[in-house]
Amino acid sequence: MDITSDVRANVLSQSFMLTRTMDYWGRTGGLSLVLPYRYVETHSGDFRASTRGISDIGMLWQINLFGGPALSREQFRSFIPETFSSFHFYLGTPLGEYDAHSALNPSSNRWVFSPTVNYSYTPDQGWTWLETYITTTVFTTNDNYQVAGASKLGQDPLVIIEGHASRNITPEIWLSLDSYYNVGGETHIDNIAQDNAANTLRLGTGIGIRAWGGGDIIVNYERVVAKPSQQPESQTIRMTLRQFW
């Protein structure tokens, strides 16, 4: 591998999420199963490597704090959206495909605990939304990291602050402007800090379309616009398909 060459990585991540909505004391909630699949490819000069497989299977629990009452299907159709806040808790498991001797893996081979609180404000009954999300992610240590003579990989907690502004153009189409600020998350190999903590700002935009009965298509684009010198340049294109029953 030519260490003077730039390193480029491409990640294709696909996730299937199945959610069961629930009634928690009159508030909307839900429990989701997340089944991810990941393809990772990297190259530098003449060096190339890739891997693919099932990533870390996860579960997501959510409960509304205010503004989101539990509704029947008939009530949901006529419900007028209002300002709301919710709590989300994601649990990532070390159940994906993992090779301890490879630095490139679909799975990270560790547990992940990630609570999120959001506040979503609408001044006009759901046509305009101003939203913020605050997430803290805590990682356990990967004690089976056997790359280049190492034995374990750890990571500091990572904080993500999101801001979103969206506007319905029609009842079926909406546009969004998005921002993400990441801080922390430095990794440690055998307790040696890797000087790769995030202090990163990403900006993006998105479009959503209600394409069929109970179904949405959402496309987002994001790009890193401010970062420490040791952090990589990054662009993300994401497409989400949702079906409600």
Region locations from a protein language model:
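Residues that define the transmembrane beta-barrel architecture of outer-membrane proteins
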Residues: 8-14, 27, 50-59, 83, ...
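Outer-membrane pore/translocation modules
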Residues: 38-154
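Residues on the lipid-exposed face of transmembrane beta-strands in outer-membrane beta-barrel proteins
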Residues: 14-20, 59-65, 89, 115-121, ...
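Surface-exposed loop and membrane-interface regions of Gram-negative outer-membrane beta-barrel proteins
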Residues: 2-9, 24-66, 185, 189
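Transmembrane beta-barrel strands of outer-membrane/channel proteins
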Residues: 31-39, 85-93, 132-138, 163, ...
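Solvent-exposed loop/turn segments connecting transmembrane beta-strands
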Residues: 8-9, 39, 43-46, 124, ...
